[in-house]
Each structure stands twice: as structure tokens, then as C-alpha cells.
Amino acid sequence: MRIVCLIEDTEGSEGKNGCAAAHGLSFYVETGAHRLLVDLGPSELTLKNAENTGTDLRDVDTVVLSHGHYDHSGGIMPFVRRNTKARIYMQRTAVGDFYSDDGESAGERFRYIGIDPEIADLPQTVAVDGDLRIDDELELFTVKHANHPIPFTNKSLLVRDGSGYARDSFDHEHYLVIHDGKRHILVSGCAHKGMPNIMEAYLGRYNAAPDIAISGFHLMKKTEYSEEEKREIGEIARQLNEYPTKYFTCHCTGMKAYEIMKSVMGDKLTYVHSGDVIPTDWI
């Protein structure tokens, strides 16, 4: 098994593999039966990073779009010009009118952050309704009940409807489970439904925790955290620490939140940068 972070918000140590950073996320995964991508970052830059890591995207057979935001989908249309065979799995609701409320001081307060609608019309796109078993190795699941708070940073993420803007419920978010021999790996994008809720849903579905969980935690802020927000981040870390899982995080977690969580979770939490390879041989 090989898992490579093709792009996220920070460059790898010492400019690892020459991979650039950008606000977005993409992982390449090799399993016994598949060559797959989870998200494709914000742009064609993801494809350039793939070349720098020696990843041949023409071999990819499966793409999973974690949710309907541009920073995870922007590389899809450039990708399909190189690879027309890979099936692209996304929730049917991922084609939505999604916006970010950037505040009163922004030049344009409500900024569109959804995907290119042409993605849904591609012949290789599979519109998923809820959970899906792809094959013996790959499954997709959704969170139907949230027993823990969702990230406080979700409050600025909206969906536009006929009467204006409403808080996004993130019913367009799903999570990939990889069963590769004895390894069981959970891959999420931003965990907008809350990583504790996702882990709880995984446990209820499989009656065990994953060996590895890879995800952004959507805790990044442009401004300083309040004391209450710091406490919430610490509580998320404590909840995740209860599972016998090794976590790899990136992208929308943000380094400040990562440092708070790292102080609680220690070696169970690692930050992954653009171009980094996630070790799996210890499982």
C-alpha cells in the first residue's frame, strides 16, 4: 500500500519532491486492487505535484470526491483530459450552490465555493445516494446522526436556496473506507460533520476503529481562537484519542489547531504536507 499527499496547504519538509502547496487537498492511494484518488485539490497544480512524486495518473481507476467544494474538485476537469477511464464517485447532492460568508468587510461577502457543475455530467461520474459498497476493498459511508458538535468554523459555510442563504448541512459529504488485507483505513476530506461523529459512525458500522484515519478537521481560522474555541479543539482531540487509531491530518485543520491537538494526542497525531508519504507498513 502507498498513500501520498499530492497537495495540501503547506509545503513538505525541505521542499519534498518539489511539491507545491495550495489551499486544497488530494491523496493518491495504491491498494492491492486499485489506484485511486481522494479529491483532486483546487487546480491543475495537483497534477503537476503528482508528476513530481512519480505518480502516473493514467493508471488511476477510481476517484472519490469527498464533498462539493472547489478546493477538493478543481483538478478533476484537468484530470479527465488525461484519464477517461476512472470512475468518479460523489454524493448526488455535491452539485449544490455552496457559498462562504467572508464577512461584511470582504469585497464580495458571499463567495461561491462549489464545484464545476460539468463534473456531474461526465459519463464516468457516479452520483451516490448515501452509503455505497464499491467492492471488497472500497466503501463509502455518510454520517446520519451527530452526537457531538460540528466544527465551529462551519458557521460561515452556506448553501443558497430560493429565499437566500442557509447553513450547509453537509449532506454532500461522504467518507472512504479502504480494506486492504489486514489494514482498515478511513479517509475523509474536511470532516465538516465533525471528526468525532465520523469516528463514532465508523465504529457503529464496523464494530471496530480504523487503523489509520486521514482527514482535515476543519478547525482553521484566519483570526485568533477564543478561549472557548481552544477548549473545543482540545475536547475534539481528547475524544479522538480514545480510539486506538493513528491520525494523519492536514489542510483545513490549520497549524495552530494542530499544535493544540498534538499536545493532547502526542504520537497518535501527525501533520501531513504536500508530497509526504503516509507510512502504513507498521499496521
Where do the protein language model's features map onto the residues?
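Cap/insert and terminal regions of metallo-dependent hydrolase folds
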Residues: 87, 169-175, 179-274
